[in-house]
Amino acid sequence: MPSVRSGTAPVLALVAAWLLLASAIGPVALGSDSATAAPESGDDPIVVDADLPTDGPTVEAVVRLEEADIPAEIGADETEQRLETHAESTQEPLLEYARGSDGLQVEETFWLTNAVLLEVDTDAVDYEAFDRFGAVEAVHENVEVSVPERPDRVNATASGAAALAGSERRTTTGLAQVNATDVWDAYDTRGEGVRVAVLDTGVDTGHPDIDLATDDPSDPTYPGGWAEFDATGGRVPGSTPHDTGTHGTHVSGTVAGGATTGTAIGVAPEAELLHGLVLTDTNGSFAQVVAGMEWAVRQDADAISLSLGATGKHAPFIDPVRNARDSGAVVVGATGNDGPETSGSPGNVYETISVGAVDRNGAVPSFSSGQRIDRTEWTAAPPDWTAPPSYVVPDVVAPGVAVTSAAPGGGYRSMPGTSMAAPHVSGTAALLLSIEPNATPDEITTAVTETARMPAAGIVAGDTTTADGTATLETRYGHGIVDAKAAADALVAARRSSDDAVAGNASDSDPREGARSPSSPVFVAGVLVAVSLTLAVLARYRIGRR
């Protein structure tokens, strides 16, 4: 057998050493970028909303740009930062073009979803003109949103004592139905340390049961706890808390109201209440809601409560909801008051905890919206949306008939609607986060939905009963009626189990992936072996050359 030349042997030995290292640790990614290059943007034509007018007066158009690619493993704070940085960099060419063009006016920019609101003179500018920008993906209308239409007449009372009179309980029926006080007693918490942002018609801070958060009690604008947004999503400077209707004060009271009458009205009365005015009386816009959500995320809101929406499936709400959730906020939304086989956005977005209504007996009222949603029914949904092919809304139901809460002017009011149900769930989320501050939105959602209970057999649910209406029950109740105590117990147990698993073993990840980490013992050992072999070969080679 021919011998290997002495000059080649060291090289082969070195190659063998480093191949040994490579086989031990596998491929290692260099840097934080994906190994696969992202496709060039702008390959596909932009999607123009068919509802956008193409002639006549100026039109408010929302121009949507490519969303940031946020790795799942990064934290909430870094997610927010990356969203803002990405929006700023990708929007600049469009903004420069709009500011220098006749027929275009920049009204607002957004980062929670990568979007710019423009006023467009359709006689001077075609929507297709935006296709010149590779980052632009779609153009759609500034969708109108509103408070879900009230299902029946609302009875108001001027006196809190009168509104709550006759009750032998020290909580409203709704709090008892979701077992809020059981959480108070078992876990010694009423929502302390948790921030809930209600986005609605405003709030009356003069109400004795409403305590709005503020960074400066001497400042009448309630900095950090209050914000008002106009129809374009612009922050209204110098705004002080007020309610343009009655809806926002009522919803806020159910989330975190007090008990000055002796009867508690709020699920999480010690939670920090934030309020963003995004509806004037009952109506608002997509831009207002997104601006309010951005503000809530910036204020480190742990939960965002949305008792509003637009009937139908409106894909523009998908990215704001999932980005808010990725930024650490639980998003809760009402399904609407249009009855079976209907729902509204953003409540019907998969990442929202969608909430329908029940009465005090556990029956779903006829007005409560719910349906099975096929993903293909969403027009222009994000291609990377992870919603399943089919899912049901609501996720859960909560008290939404004759719900008593605060009313502007210091009184109390009984109101129906899924708008009243949603804040019961937002308050429940606050209780859970007070117990487990590090719980993720996914963990909160799982705890709330998987512990919800169905009513006893025979309870009327729309046109069916629990005894024989399984298909209808699914779209009327979702997982069932929210049970705050059961959800708290499940969350605590799940996190304890997770902590025990981490402490007693290792992660659930593929051990081969851990071996490829530059900080892993396998990686370090492999490097040391390769370096040692290299040094030994070089030393021997030098000796042989002497």
Feature names for model-found ranges:
Residues 74, 171-176, 180-256, 260-267, ...:
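Active-site core segment of subtilase-fold serine proteases
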Residues 58, 192-195, 269-274, 299-304, ...:
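Loop/turn elements at helix/coil->beta-strand transitions in domains of secreted/extracellular proteins
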Residues 303-305, 352, 434-515:
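C-terminal subdomain of the subtilisin-like protease fold in secreted/lumenal serine endopeptidases
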Residues 234-313, 356-359, 455:
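Subtilisin-like peptidase catalytic core
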Residues 344-434, 486:
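Extracellular S/T/G-rich loop segment that most often corresponds to the catalytic His/Ser-adjacent loop
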Residues 1-41, 322, 502-546:
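Secretory targeting signatures
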Residues 3-4, 10, 93-175, 216, ...:
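Autoinhibitory propeptides
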